[in-house]
Amino acid sequence: MDIDPYKEFGATVELLSFLPSDFFPSVRDLLDTASALYREALESPEHCSPHHTALRQAILCWVELMTLATWVGNNLQDPASRDLVVNYVNTNMGLKIRQLLWFHISCLTFGRETVLEYLVSFGVWIRTPPAYRPPNAPILSTLPETTVVRRRDRGRSPRRRTPSPRRRRSQSPRRRRSQSRESQC
């Protein structure tokens, strides 16, 4: 069976494969980030979003994989075989879990559309011959605001990005349209 865990989120394994393996933080760092940002939603019995569900599943898979690796480490007598198993888990399974955790944490943090735009931008950048591409790769946190898809209220015209030079700006602070970290779901 050829199952792509990113398909329902608009991405593919191939799209994530453009990112080098050392791009992804360690599993420990990703788990700490998920816990710090989304612990309440992840532990909640309520359904929050498909990304929360996928993140829960990836975390549970990692816990089970570590349980298996510990068992193998304790029960496999041959050190060479033990090293082969540990290296395989760290190299192959570890990378897949790091990719999954990064993708879903990033989608929850930056928004799915922004992450997909980043993956496409990076994929284009990495496939462009070095002589024809900018020296620095795209950075997720610095993608232009225009990549974020925003809802518009019906019946209202879109707001201007810059005020007219003849008009004074309102004294009230501008509201941010991004989702606050307080509301996890």
Curated annotation (Swiss-Prot):
Residues 157-179 are annotated as: 3 X 8 AA repeats of S-P-R-R-R-[PR]-S-Q. Disulfide bonds: none annotated. GO terms for cellular component: host cell; host cell cytoplasm; T=4 icosahedral viral capsid. Phosphorylated by host SRPK1, SRPK2, and maybe protein kinase C or GAPDH. Phosphorylation is critical for pregenomic RNA packaging. Protein kinase C phosphorylation is stimulated by HBx protein and may play a role in transport of the viral genome to the nucleus at the late step during the viral replication cycle. Residues 149-178 have a biased composition (Basic residues). One of its GO terms (biological process) is viral penetration into host nucleus. GO terms for molecular function: DNA binding; RNA binding; structural molecule activity. Coiled coil: none annotated. InterPro entries: Hepatitis_core, Viral_capsid_core_dom_sf_HBV. Residues 136-185 are annotated as: Disordered. A motif (Bipartite nuclear localization signal) lies at residues 160-177. The modification Phosphoserine is found at S157, S164, S172. Keywords: Capsid protein, Cytoplasmic inwards viral transport, DNA-binding, Host cytoplasm, Host-virus interaction, Microtubular inwards viral transport, Phosphoprotein, Repeat, RNA-binding, T=4 icosahedral capsid protein, Viral penetration into host nucleus, Virion, Virus entry into host cell. HAMAP family: HBV_HBEAG. Self assembles to form an icosahedral capsid. Most capsids appear to be large particles with an icosahedral symmetry of T=4 and consist of 240 copies of capsid protein, though a fraction forms smaller T=3 particles consisting of 180 capsid proteins. Entering capsids are transported along microtubules to the nucleus. Phosphorylation of the capsid is thought to induce exposure of nuclear localization signal in the C-terminal portion of the capsid protein that allows binding to the nuclear pore complex via the importin (karyopherin-) alpha and beta. This is Capsid protein. It comes from Hepatitis B virus genotype A2 (isolate Japan/11D11HCCW/1998). The gene is C.
